[in-house]
Amino acid sequence: MIDVNKFESMQIGLASPNKIRSWSYGEVKKPETINYRTLKPEKDGLFDERIFGPTKDWSCACGKYKGVRYRGIVCDRCGVEVTSSKVRRERMGHIELAAPVTHIWYFKGIPSRMGLVLDISPRLLEEVIYFAAYIVIDPGDTDLEPKQLLTEAEYREQKAKYGNRFEAKMGAEAIRELLKKVDLDKEVKNLKKELQTATGQKRTRAIRRLDILDAFKNSGNKPEWMVMDAVPVIPPDLRPMVQLEGGRFATSDLNDLYRRVINRNNRLKRLLDLNAPNIIVQNEKRMLQEAVDALIDNGRRGRPVVGPGNRPLKSLSHMLKGKQGRFRQNLLGKRVDYSGRSVIDVSPKLKFYQCGVPRPMALELFKPFVMHELVKRGIASNIKNAKRKIDREDDDIWDVLEDVIKERPVLLNRAPTLHRLSIQAFEPVLVPGKSIRLHPLACEAYNADFDGDQMAIHVPLSDEAVAESRLLMLAAHHILAPKDGKPIVTPSQDVVLGNYWLTQAERGREGEGMIFSSPAEATVAYENGDIHYHTIIGMSADAMPKKPWPKGHEHGIFITTYGKLVFNQLFPDDYFYVNEPTEKNLNDPLDAKYFLNEGEDINSKINEVADDLIASPFKSSFLSDSIATIYKYYKVQRTSEYLDDLKELGYTSSTTSGITIGMNDVPEIGDKDEKVAKARKQVDVVSKQFRRGLITEQERHDRVISIWNACKDEIQNEIAQIHSPRNPISIMADSGARGNISNFTQLAGMRGLMATPNGGLFEIPVTSNFKEGLSVLELFMSTHGARKGMTDTALKTAQSGYLTRRLVDVAQDVIIRDDDCGTDRGITVSAIMEGDEMIEPLFDRLVGRFTAETVKDPETGEAIVGRDVMMDENMAHKICDAGVTHVKIRSILTCDTPHGVCRKCYGMNLATGEEVEVGEAVGTVAAQSIGEPGTQLTLRTFHNGGVAGAEDITQGLPRVQELFEARNPKGRATISEVDGVIDSIQENPAEHTREITVKGKIDTRSYSVPYTASVAVSEGDYVHRGDKLTLGSVDPKELIQVTDTLTTEKYILAEVQKAYRMQGVDIADKHVEVLTRQMLQKVRVLDPGETDILPGEVMDIGQFRDRNKEVIISGGIPATAQSIILSITKAALETNSFLSAASFQETTRVLTDASIRGKNDPLLGLKENVIIGKIIPAGTGMPIYRSMEPEADVKKPDSVYSIADIEKQMKEKDKTK
């Protein structure tokens, strides 16, 4: 086999008949497969051992030569070469055809390649190929035209008239002769000449023909190779035949298709030998043509060939296509050895970098390692005995297993793998039972729960794989989410509940006002029952000398609760004391108001600050902020410890708290019935107005809905006022552990209006709540909404998954390729607004980006941040506080790195908080970051209740798809094509339109917009090109024609951000930029100048510039082109890699086109390297990492730590507790 790591690129081309014969190890002459009695392959058949190699390793068919020592010998009795049976996966045969046949891909594809080369329409071509008409090949001196079609009757007539003075044939033979006659150079020359004058349809056809002929000319493929003399037979192990129980056989469909070809071919040979009448021969040739068509692409023309049960047979094309095809099933995703799967279960005792692996599973996964160790230790005498010991599960193997797994991490994966955090590495810990145990904080990243979810486990085998798992994939490293740089390991449920309860404050608890000299003293008091967690106490700052205290209070006494004191023990010793859940307290010392002034009584101080303490227990959102802050100051290791401690404390506290829910925790509302009766009266009034014809049906419906919503809100507000903050349900909702006020309303107030299946609302509300119980009708109405919720979720998951697939495909080859591309361009960013609503603040757009020019204070003119500096949070705050509204930053959109991005234009890697490394696969990360939250977006298109003007706006997932697929948006806005002033807005009642006139410096433009459209401008306003004249969504295709690429990219960026942020999903700009850039990578050539580019050709902007550079250097006229926007699907198919495009969609079309052009795949992206089995060119697969040599390092660096180090620290910590 060839070593895939040895070659640089991969080329595809058309195979000539001689090439097909050179691949072959012999001709398949008979349709037989295997002998029914001996079950051995038949001679000259489809499984012949002489052609394809032996079925048994190192043994010929007759058994004369057996064993490796005879390797390479060809048996003189049976003619089989003695070799490994693996060759039956790679050796090909061929069928020598009695008549040539055309290849259906090139004749039937759109556009028909054969038709374009010969300049014959596909319909006429079909008549010739399938023997319905003759075609004139050489008219001689007759008055016939070349390539003229003749029916059977016409042909006879002409034959009688002219005899042999002309030549006309039918079938593939005729096509081959015509293709041989095509003079490519001459045709190309003529077409280029024609293009100078041609217009309209003629020009389009000429460009298409020129494109194909030029491709043949440049690739070295010959047009006549589209017609085949010999058909290759693929290796037998790729179309196997296996015996089932009961003696029957199951076979691949390909064998049936090959048999049809061989049978028809043999019959045709016999007919030709017998000199059969022409009509019979022609019929047989047509049948042979159809058999080969079915073999190559069954069902492409006419009715497909069917097998038993009317099932269409799977042809060679079907073996490549779709999810079950070769590309996606076997090349991009393989089943792997050393893996298992099981149900997952929670284990709160694990450390953050550990997972529990069931003993039997671990034994099976690490079997070879255990066997090796058993032999090494002398417990077993050889490998066979070791295996036997393991199968018997002897007692002495478990200790060995414990030692074997110590330094070997395992990978855990949960499907669906939506982003890179769905596969993480853990240190295995042996556990009893059969379920895999997961750390509770790892659930968020996996989106896992324990209601029956399953996970797959994989063992990294090589030393490199183990090292990468430990250093790059260990769960303890994955604290921040790559999509927005915020912590993904946020505590939830019990942990949140426990810490919230722990940090609550209560007046009048036992021991209030006691002052302690140290936390240890307070703990003793708590254990003696003198104080409670919620007791407000005084604490000496001297007890925590390393903490930063406010100036002048370093030795003072501050007010806190014992619970908060316990919580603060989790933080590092030199971190601030946190008393209130604010960003200020996380980044600055404790507020001085909590400290006793000299001579002040503690009780008066408690009265002063008690309200602040009572109002500030630590909620879920604050815990998340605290994780981010600890990560910012102390990095991975300390954050990992903090998370584990937070989990421990949360579980302990929620157990101690004893919080439960009972029926009596749901409060009663006194005047609910009156409120409902009042609403009913209002509804009656509205119905009366409708009956009298004062309002329309739509208005009546809208008013009824708003009356009931108002009634529900009123009840909800009352519940919010009467429920006590110590109510267990309130504690759960307020802390963020589970539920919200709406759940409370449904339990205690009323359920309100229910959704109808078509997305509207029922007018009859559910006035009962769950405590009272629902009536039968109310329950029935509720079921519609519940069912709609379920179906919507299922649909959304599928939509979102497909979006992710397209995004990954278009961006997979975007990798950080160098340090700095040296560009002086950038984009100017400001806050994204929607009317008065802030969508994305400037601060979010600056953090982690490099400045493109110095940022100056708008008032003083002083430099705040220099040029080419990566802005961290502090710098971004400074810029925003100084009142700067626009900042020019380095951007992916303006990066000049070919086939990727440079570090400076990308900025910070959000998952680590550091500058991005060369080799980071930022394209895939961007696609995952946008696709993964797709399931959280709505599927709805909002309808505006019949208000004239404002169009229905598309939001959520459909809007994101609309943008990335560059579709014509719903409710399209009209945009101005010129810079100028709005001259007039006139109504045209006859046409039901308005006429908006824009007066520019050079010309004046008028736009006719519908009456219903909301006009966004007034007379006298100044508008720029691309500005909206009416409200709605701009069509990016229109925008790019009126403005430039950058404006279009910025528009798409802002719109995608709106769609996500309106649903409360934060995604960093850079991810959207990566994908937007991919959509605008291509240009369409308008005038080729003196280059060899064809007019109308779509090409990469980088290639276009390179070609122009060459022409300008040699003094020629450069080509001109226009930027175009491609949808992500189209962009993925237009990529330079045919392997990546073929494995995405439209496999046969991509391969047809690539082979005619003789395309060369440079193997730059990830997919194409995975397909051929080469190491991917990202991360440690980059050439700079591959060529590294290990060196002995004398000094141990501080930054790299091992699991053993952490364990040591944890043990020391446990001792001190």
Curated annotation (Swiss-Prot):
The entry's keywords: DNA-directed RNA polymerase, Magnesium, Metal-binding, Nucleotidyltransferase, Transcription, Transferase, Zinc
Function statement: DNA-dependent RNA polymerase catalyzes the transcription of DNA into RNA using the four ribonucleoside triphosphates as substrates.
Binding annotation for Zn(2+) 1: 60, 62, 75, 78
Molecular function via GO: DNA binding; DNA-directed RNA polymerase activity; magnesium ion binding; zinc ion binding
SMART domains: RPOLA_N
Name assigned to this protein: DNA-directed RNA polymerase subunit beta'
Similarity field: Belongs to the RNA polymerase beta' chain family.
Matching SUPFAM superfamilies: beta and beta-prime subunits of DNA dependent RNA-polymerase
Cofactor binding note of this UniProt entry: Binds 1 Mg(2+) ion per subunit. Binds 2 Zn(2+) ions per subunit.
Reactions accelerated catalytically: RNA(n) + a ribonucleoside 5'-triphosphate = RNA(n+1) + diphosphate
One matching Pfam family: RNA_pol_Rpb1_4
Species this protein is from: Lactobacillus acidophilus (strain ATCC 700396 / NCK56 / N2 / NCFM)
Record-linked HAMAP family: RNApol_bact_RpoC (MF_01322)
Magnesium found in the keyword field: yes
